[in-house]
Amino acid sequence: MRKLNPYFGEFGGQYVPEILIPALDQLEQAFIDAQNDPSFQQEFQDLLKNYAGRPTALTLCRNLTQGTRTRLYLKREDLLHGGAHKTNQVLGQALLAKRMGKTEIIAETGAGQHGVATALACALLNMKCRIYMGAKDVERQSPNVFRMRLMGAEVIPVHSGSSTLKDACNEALRDWSGCYERAHYLLGTAAGPHPYPTIVREFQRMIGDEAKAQILAREGRLPDAVIACIGGGSNAIGLFASFIPETSVQLIGVEPAGKGIETGEHGAPLKHGKLGIYFGMKSPIMQTEEGQIEESYSISAGLDFPSVGPQHAHLNSIGRADYVSVTDDEAIEAFKTLSRREGIIPALESSHALAYALKLIAQNPDKEQLLIVNLSGRGDKDIFTVNDILAARGEI
């Protein structure tokens, strides 16, 4: 009998081949046991503090908001070991895998940040590591590929389909179905078959828990809005989870509009997709008129995903969270602006959330507002991509 609800409203579920059901049931039970085991929690918290570097800072952007009445804070997941929020839940899942007696880890990665986090956790915990990555992403994220291999991971380029994240996910699941007795599939986002969306949220929720305590200590009140980018949605649900009960706080998720929603080259299934079943879950998906999975597109590899986590779909359906989109060009402008005005180079993924915050500020410069943006990762991995774009424009 299930202990955790596999659905968020009508979204979620467990649509996988029958062969994987025992592995998912084992994972669910291990997670429940671990959540109630003080020694597991102590080990996890110790790794987060003394290995990963939590809590992360909440940084006030004084320069960006000059001349306005906005106070804009960044939740600095870019300062976490590994360079992004991914490290949080990877450490949790890797400890779970050890607890279940697994010796191998299988993972997928888009921007490479989840791959790096998985590689470092496997090195630390002495586990074999296989990471599937779309061939296109291997090209555009070469620094992260090198980091993964340096830490002992086997990186497997995927050439099928669009050679991006969705194809890497498919290959990782296929691999796992043949070796789940010895391997754990370390899924990188709050999506996929139950119980992954719940596990990933719970192993990321310290982002929002910390941000809430930090903003209350600094400002004496809750923020008016918290803003995060959305690919699969793990950094956003990690930030949102603590604020969902606080109805005065607006939750804003920012999907990638890519080259513009009207061009069809985007990654915004929540607002522009149709309900379907993909990657083991029921959630909005980018689909063709024939019902096939449509290729998503974003300049940021970590947002280039044709579906979205089921809890975001639920929050959208009940109106608790607002989902908007930002184009490649707007994200690049935000990337440049934060780098030049605050000396912080953000990931292109995080730049989408920042771009929307800057829009809000520009629209209401005289409005007193308190905002938190989740700076989900650092931009080292994106400097070559942005350099090429700016060089082509003659801007550098």
From Swiss-Prot:
A GO term, aspect molecular function: tryptophan synthase activity
Enzyme class: lyase
Residues recorded as bearing N6-(pyridoxal phosphate)lysine in the entry: 86
Cofactor: pyridoxal 5'-phosphate
Keyword annotations from UniProtKB, A to Z: Amino-acid biosynthesis, Aromatic amino acid biosynthesis, Lyase, Pyridoxal phosphate, Tryptophan biosynthesis
Pathway membership, UniProt: Amino-acid biosynthesis; L-tryptophan biosynthesis; L-tryptophan from chorismate: step 5/5
CDD domains from the UniProt entry: Trp-synth_B
Catalytic reaction equation(s): (1S,2R)-1-C-(indol-3-yl)glycerol 3-phosphate + L-serine = D-glyceraldehyde 3-phosphate + L-tryptophan + H2O
Pfam families: PALP (PF00291)
Organism domain of life: Bacteria
EC number(s) per entry: 4.2.1.20
GO cellular component, one term: cytoplasm
Assembly notes: Tetramer of two alpha and two beta chains.
Family per record: Belongs to the TrpB family.
PANTHER family, A to Z: TRYPTOPHAN SYNTHASE, TRYPTOPHAN SYNTHASE-RELATED
Function according to Swiss-Prot or TrEMBL: The beta subunit is responsible for the synthesis of L-tryptophan from indole and L-serine.
Protein's recorded name: Tryptophan synthase beta chain
Gene encoding the protein: trpB
